[in-house]
Each structure stands twice: as C-alpha cells, then as structure tokens.
Swiss-Prot record:
It is an enzyme of class 1 (oxidoreductase). This is 1-deoxy-D-xylulose 5-phosphate reductoisomerase. Catalyzes the NADPH-dependent rearrangement and reduction of 1-deoxy-D-xylulose-5-phosphate (DXP) to 2-C-methyl-D-erythritol 4-phosphate (MEP). GO terms for molecular function: 1-deoxy-D-xylulose-5-phosphate reductoisomerase activity; manganese ion binding; NADPH binding. It catalyses: 2-C-methyl-D-erythritol 4-phosphate + NADP(+) = 1-deoxy-D-xylulose 5-phosphate + NADPH + H(+).
Length: 394
C-alpha cells in the first residue's frame, strides 16, 4: 500500500503538531507533501519541513526570503515557499490525498473550499468553515465521504453512525466538559481573567479554542457543525456536560439504543482517523483502562449561565449568513477578552448584540464574497461595541 499524501494546514498549532506526531508514529503510512502556517513561528515550521522532508511550505504572514532562510538554517534545501493570505488555499488546492485543515478561525474557509474542489479528502478541524460557509462547503463537496471531521465530538458521531442507517438516527448527543467554570453562576464568572479561562480541566488547546470552551461558544459552533456535517436538525442535537471527557459524543437511534465512542482525551485519535479514514491507525492513542474503578457522569447544560448554545441555535434558524456573523463577532470579542479589553461575560454578550443587529442578508449574498462581507460587518460592529465599554450581558 502506497503512502497517503497529506497537506497539513496550521502545522505549528496544537492540531498540526499532534498530526505530525501521528505521522511520525506510523512510518510509511503517510507522506507529508505540504505544510502551511500563519508565520508566527518560522523556526518550528522550518524544523517540521526538514524533519518530514516536505517539498512545499506556505506562510500567510511572512516574506519568502525569511521563510527560505529559516529552512536553510534548519538544514533544509530545495523547498518551495508560498506566501501571502492565499498561500494556504493555493497549497490546499494542489490535489493531495488528504488535506488536514487545522487552521483556527474563519480564514480556514477558503482552504477548505480549495481542498474540496481539488477532490482531496478533507480532514476538518477548522469548525469555522462549516459554521461560516455551510452552503459553500456543501456546493464544493464532490462525494458524501469527502469530509472527515477531526473534532473529537464529530469524529465520535461519525464512528457511532456506522452502527445504523441515517434513517434510524433519532438524536445526536454532543458531550461538553463544561470548561473551567462548570457549576459557576454568572455572578461568580463576572471577574474571570484570561488566565482562569485558559486553565481547561481536560484538554490542551490554543487560547481561542480554550476561551470558547470556557464560554461554551465552542459547543455552540460544534452544534452548528454537527447540523451541517450530518444533516440533522438542530432540534435533534442535544448537548450534555460530561466532565471526564471520555465519552466524546453519542448517537441515539429510533429503537432506544445509544451508541457512544469513548477514549481518554487525546486529539491524536480523531486526527489519526481523519488522516486514515475509513481505516484506523493501530496505537494512535491509549485506550480506556478497565482495571481500576472509574465513573462517568452526565448533567444538563446550565443555559442561563452559558447562553452561547441558545445563540448558536438562533443563528441557524435566522439565515444562512447568521452563523458567519456569530463566529466573526465571537472571534473579535474573544481577542478583546484575551487582551484585557473586555470582561468575560461580555464576550457572549457582545456576540448576542451583534447577532441581534444583523439585518436580513440581501438576495444573492450566499457566496464567498457574501460570507466575507457579513463577517466584515460583524467584526466592525463587535469592535465598536468593545470600544463602547459598558456591559453588554444578554
């Protein structure tokens, strides 16, 4: 069996570095033919390119000469360098067997579309692609199994769905750790600092995703993602809090059966599945242990304390562009919180204001340019609300 060629977008981030761990642990199974990164850590990108003998690298923010110099300093030689805002999409469109999109944020949409249009299997960790551009992604998708989710929750659902026909599915159940503030009241969360929000109890992730987990906006985005990926109405998608993060999600079938996927929290497992789907990679991650007493608990989400899930449901019902507005406004609000310019509770409060003010999109707006225009409006409005200063709790 020949090695599966892989392009990895977001190689210096959390998903990217773990994906390269998976590749290194399965010699001969995968061949990395392209790496893309934002450009904040050129030394790491260069080391990755040299270690995996990668012929092409793409950098969103950086000069070709600087990237080439970093690769030479790491011991590399003939590496093609792409730079600029469109570099990742250029690389994604070159037709590798698999493109793993581990980019954070809505900038991942264009590379997602490029990979799909090129016919590559898309191992998708960039949930914003589906949140912001669901209709565009569906239009670009060439076959039913072309998108393989890398989020642990959606990977779990994809695995559980193997147990029955789609017509037999009654409900999807997404699990949430509850984040660092599970059980807290809104009053208790009023003074939360970025340091507190970034102290996730079970997962090691980047600052934006970790903050989204603290507000539960991450779960709201995942709810939209599940709705798009599996074509299940949002009314039939339930979110439950599972603090142990061992059961990653479940599928309830019409006969009353519930099929769950369980494993210790380790992103290497869904990453390996994304790269090898529909096959499994032996030893990708450690299994559950059954030689010691343990317990798994589940509890409902406190929607009053964490309104992000309701916002996500409202966005889906409002229009195809409202989810893009939700996501863009949230990215701006999270950045302001991490910079110390916005209180924790006002992150979701700001998103609620922006979402409520967004007008009905004009006819014909459902294009990449239309999505980008909606995002630009949402970012500008979110920044303006942050600059205003007073509390915007919902």
């Amino acid at each position: 069996m020949s090695a599966r060629t892989v392009v990895l977008l977001g190689s210096t981030g959390s998903i990217g570095t773990q994906a390269l761990d998976v590749v290194a642990a399965a010699p001969g199974r995968f061949q990395v033919v392209g790496l893309a990164a934002g450009g904040s850590d050129l030394e790491l990108l260069a080391r990755q390119a040299v270690a995996h003998d990668v012929p092409v690298v793409a950098v969103a923010a950086g000069e070709q000469d600087d990237v080439a110099a970093a690769i030479r300093a790491a011991g590399g030689r003939r590496t093609e360098v792409l730079t600029g805002p469109g570099a990742a999409a250029d690389l994604a469109g070159r037709g590798a067997d698999v493109v793993l999109n581990g980019i954070t944020g809505s900038v991942g949409l264009a590379p997602t579309l490029a990979a799909l249009e090129a016919g590559s299997t898309l191992a998708l960790a960039n949930k914003e692609s589906l949140v912001a551009g669901a209709a565009l992604v569906r239009a670009a998708q060439q076959r039913a199994d072309q998108i393989v989710p890398v989020d642990s929750e959606h990977s779990a659902i994809a695995q559980a769905l193997r147990s029955g026909a789609r017509s037999e599915v009654a409900r999807l159940v997404l699990t949430a750790s509850g984040g660092p503030f599970r059980g807290w009241s809104r009053e208790q969360m009023a003074g939360v600092t970025p340091e507190q929000a970034l102290a996730h109890p079970t997962w090691a992730m980047g600052p934006v995703v970790t903050t989204n987990s603290a507000t539960l906006m991450n779960k709201g985005l995942e709810l939209i993602e599940a709705h798009v990926l599996f074509d299940v109405p949002v009314a039939d998608i339930t979110v439950v809090v599972h603090p142990q993060s061992v059961v990653h999600s479940m599928v309830e079938f019409v006969d009353g059966s519930t099929i769950a996927q369980a494993s210790p929290p380790d992103m290497r497992l869904p990453i390996a599945l994304g790269l090898a789907w529909p096959d499994r990679v032996p030893g990708a991650a450690s299994p559950c242990r059954w030689d010691a007493a343990t317990s798994w608990t589940f509890e409902p989400v406190d929607d009053a304390a964490f309104p992000a899930l309701d916002l996500a449901r409202e966005a889906v019902k409002a229009s195809p562009l409202h989810p893009a507005v939700l996501n863009a406004a949230n990215e701006e609000a999270v950045a302001a919180f991490l910079d110390g310019r916005l209180p924790f509770l006002d992150v979701v409060g700001t998103v609620a204001r922006v979402l409520g003010e967004y007008p009905d999109p004009p006819d014909g707006a459902l294009s990449l340019e239309g999505v980008q225009a909606a995002e630009a409006w949402a970012r500008a409005r979110s920044r303006a609300l942050v600059a205003d200063g007073p509390s915007r709790e919902r």
